[in-house]
């Protein structure tokens, strides 16, 4: 929980869109505008009575265009307009300008929700930047050891300087309070995992970030890799934005395209642990965000030795 949040709740859910649905604050008659092109299927259920609009980019212009004609309100009765982005996410690991989106959302009477899972509370503070609600799947916080999938939801403070009130944040708080949700009952094992994870979070996340940076630099220099997306690289479309949005580095994820083989073929040449290790754990993990027949790989750096990881990847790339 960030010091700047008004309250935080835990939800048992597979991922952030599922948690947002379970919170019940996006209601029938609302419009939900989302940029999550690598996770669009997650919005296909759970928001059936809402007008869900998927946009092709994280820009203010895209969200504003998708919001036209909707008469939104910050009153508890609604209807409400929701804007959903990831602090790092989408194909290409995009980094939206959360400050600009936060300002534009308030002008449009929209409620900005940020999935902060990839960056984590260590790497980004969406509430400080303009979001009214920040949600984060806790796989990495729990170091991959949680008995079940948990998502934390933090609500922004509505009291601003000079006794001003942020109507958007107050609306989000009122909606959540109105649901009257009971606190999630955690087992003793879950409490221990969370406490240990939070105690060690800073050091572990810095290790994830540092290793991602090293692996991104290795991949960018590898002749067997077609292209690399990592927010620190100047070739990334959001590099300039990311320097002012992200903290302690540029996140734990790197995306790259293979030159001469598919993701499925590449995985077959690697040890199984790259695919089967727990999400958020110490072992570097790979996925195929566009499917195994495509050539795109997404890498989440663990805390393992990046030289060993790079050597293993290099062997597979050259086979």
List each language-model region with its residue ranges:
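Conserved residues at beta->alpha junctions
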Residues: 13, 300-303
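Generic recognition of short, well-ordered alpha-helical segments
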Residues: 96, 311-312
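C-terminal alpha-helix
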Residues: 312, 316-319
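N-terminal glycine-rich, Lys/His-bearing helix-loop that initiates the first secondary-structure elements
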Residues: 1, 294, 315
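Generic structural motif
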Residues: 16, 127, 156-158, 233, ...
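Conserved PLP-enzyme active-site core in the AAT-like
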Residues: 2-222
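Conserved C-terminal alpha-helix-loop-beta "cap" of PLP-dependent enzymes
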Residues: 224-301, 308-311
């Amino acid at each position: 929980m960030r010091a700047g949040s008004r309250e935080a709740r835990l939800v048992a859910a597979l991922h952030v869109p599922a948690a947002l649905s379970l919170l019940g604050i996006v209601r029938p008659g609302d419009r939900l505008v989302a940029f999550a092109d690598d996770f669009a299927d997650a919005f296909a259920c759970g928001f059936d009575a809402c007008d869900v609009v998927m946009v092709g980019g994280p820009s203010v212009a895209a969200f504003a265009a998708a919001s036209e004609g909707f008469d939104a309100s910050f009153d508890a009765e609604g209807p409400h307009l929701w804007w959903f982005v990831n602090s790092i996410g989408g194909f290409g690991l995009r980094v939206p300008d959360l400050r600009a989106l936060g300002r534009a959302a308030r002008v449009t009477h929209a409620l900005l929700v940020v999935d902060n899972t990839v960056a984590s509370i260590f790497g980004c503070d969406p509430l400080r930047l303009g979001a009214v609600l920040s949600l984060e799947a806790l796989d990495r916080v729990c170091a991959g050891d949680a008995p079940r999938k948990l998502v934390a939801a933090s609500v922004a403070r509505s009291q601003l300087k000079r006794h001003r009130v942020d109507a958007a944040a107050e609306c989000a708080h009122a909606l959540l309070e109105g649901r009257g949700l009971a606190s999630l009952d955690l087992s003793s094992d879950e409490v221990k995992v969370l406490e240990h994870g939070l105690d060690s979070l800073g050091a572990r996340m810095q290790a994830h970030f540092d290793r991602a940076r090293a692996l991104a630099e290795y991949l960018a220099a590898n002749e067997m890799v077609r292209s690399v997306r990592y927010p620190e690289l100047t070739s990334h479309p959001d590099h300039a934005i990311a320097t002012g949005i992200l903290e302690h580095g540029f996140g734990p994820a790197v995306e790259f395209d293979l030159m001469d083989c598919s993701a499925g073929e590449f995985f077959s040449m690697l040890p199984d642990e790259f695919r089967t290790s727990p999400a958020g754990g110490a072992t570097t993990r790979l996925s195929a965000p566009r499917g195994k027949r495509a050539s795109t790989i997404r890498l989440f750096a663990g805390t393992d030795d990046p030289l060993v990881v790079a050597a293993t990847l290099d062997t597979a790339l050259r086979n």
